[in-house]
Amino acid sequence: GFCPIEDVYAFPDGWYESWDLTDKDMTPVIGIQSNLWTELVHNDDRFDFMIYPRLCALAESGWTEAKNKNYADFSCRLNSAYELFDELGIYYFDYRDPSAHKEPEGPVIKKKGAPKPKMDYRD
């Protein structure tokens, strides 16, 4: 589902607090990763739109301690990233003006029911 950039930037702050993890439990955790399920990503524009600028927010979230995070400051820095996206021809979601880049339409998915069995009635 849709994940606002503010939520991505806030990750992983507090997401695991309710799990009652010990320091030992957290030892194998060395970083964060981002996934994109691509079964409905049919071209490069849709791919870019789905990950940018959220990937920037997640990257900064990974190297910034929770106490140093400031979404307003991040938003200002993100403006430079938008300039770079434009230079590189990346089709991104612009949270400042969502109508600037409309979401590329995905493929039409037609759901088919199970094939009807052929019935042969004999006396």
Predicted regions and their residues:
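Substrate-binding groove of N-acetylhexosamine-processing glycoside hydrolases
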Residues: 1-123
